Amino acid sequence: MKYNILLTGSQGTLGKEIFKRIDKSKHNLYQHSFSKNYDLKIDFSNPIEIQKAENFIKEKNINCLINNAGVYSNKNFIDLNENEIYSIFNINLIAPIILSKYLYKNLTENSKEGLIINVNSLAGKYANYDETIYSSSKFGLTGFSSCLSINQKKSKIKVIDCHLGAMKTKMTSNRKNYDSMMNPDEIANFIVDLIESNNEYIISSFEVRNSK
């Protein structure tokens, strides 16, 4: 199937690796970032700005959404100010929900097939010390993905929730176990394989973690 893909968080380490691996001769790929020189420039920390994506998704006939944008925090939640908390939830949870809504609405109204891939975290299934707000936002994404995936039986839109272990990225570069983390290129291969898979089985959620 040919997809018109919107990849959020294209400026990040994993986003760049996903971009490299998607077959541009087969799919139309549109990149999002909060900075210029990308197809869709939106600051997801601002919920008003997120609304700008509605027309973009409709005009480009987006039928594959990769919710990859995310922000990490391991601050104790009492040390985070209110704006930081809002920002984490807006980027990690609210933006994927609203973007999925726009795509879902456009595709279901036209009875078209589609795919939503939520790049989640193991922190969205297992609570971690000093990751209260980050983990809570990812738990929210897990719940949203689970609820939305129930509709797969009634719609033509697949929803896949990817719970990833820690990767070597800029966000994790200061962590003590950085050297033992997974390589983003390997994770990107998993995600691109999901796009290219044409099987009839429904994969609603899975985990990827380091075996070491």
Please give the residue ranges for each predicted region.
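Rossmann-fold cofactor-recognition segment
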Residues: 34-48
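Active-site helix of classical SDR
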Residues: 100, 137-138
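Residue(s) in the substrate-gating loop at a strand-loop-helix junction
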Residues: 121
